[in-house]
């Protein structure tokens, strides 16, 4: 779902270090919970979930004994604002989980950008992407909308659905994801209101 420096764990960690989140400044190591490419996930039941019955959570987060979150409170165009619930819910979701929260549909492929490499075909567990005439296409009947193909594409040719979740649905899905992560586990949250930015950081 995310492109650029948050597309895979190594560059994500480098970006964190450059922004002051390193073991030297925080005393904690950084682990990207859903693994190198966002595919290491645990399926977690959402107690009483209305929009999400089973959340796709980064596996390393579900292996933790306790959740301690340090949140930068800020504005968000998609959700209005972001704090602990957004940090836990969206941040804890695997790539497929983030896709589920952000979108109600299925990805599509830009033929102009596609080079026919087959990365999307190899990552898909459902056989939805196919290569025809040296270009990938998605069989929407087979696609489950998990978004793994988005992260696998080296050319950013696989795009999320144009119609995203409404703000109300997105906020509710994030809250349900946060509930799936926190339910029945000890947790502690600190939110800082400093350098409030108008967009997600």
Stretch-by-stretch model annotation:
Residues 2-201:
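Extended, low-polarity segments enriched in aliphatic/aromatic residues
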